[in-house]
Amino acid sequence: CWSLVGSEMCIRDRVMAANTTEGIIGAGTLLSKEDVYAAKRAGASFGVSPGVTDQILNACAEVKLPLLPGAATPSEVMNLLSKGYSVQKFFPAQSNGGIAALKSILGPMPDVSFCPTGGVTSTNALDYLSLENVVCVGGSWVAPKDKIKAADWQAITKLAHHASALSKHSDA
């Protein structure tokens, strides 16, 4: 997922450079309907938000942009589930109970799957991925700000390869 932070052109460049047989480009962090429209214009295949508003949901529906909406509480999870979102971003994961919270949510809400972000690291990613209701994880460890600022694409590529090797069935 590529950050929108003032960079519709950046997403467009990534979409044009991507080999669609190897992956898709998502856009985040969507915070407004304008962000949704910018992501769609840039060619993003999906959007990601840390939380959700009716404005974001309506804009995504209007432009047919699939959304990974954020939720942090059982009420937010239930609200999104009632609107058809069975896969949700759990953010910020660590400060909202992390693995223990996701285990607790599984009992009463087994039909919801999550992508936890916020406090997920290369060290604890496999712990999250071992959970039945976690389909993937996200974390800034893949592209740390210092590596981006230094244009250290080789280091970021190495981190991305390591992250892509993580799975529910690996010991990476």
Language model segments and positions:
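Short helix-capping segments at alpha-helix termini
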Residues: 17-23, 109-111, 170-172
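Glycine-rich phosphate-binding active-site loops on the catalytic face of alpha/beta enzymes
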Residues: 50-56, 89-99, 133-155
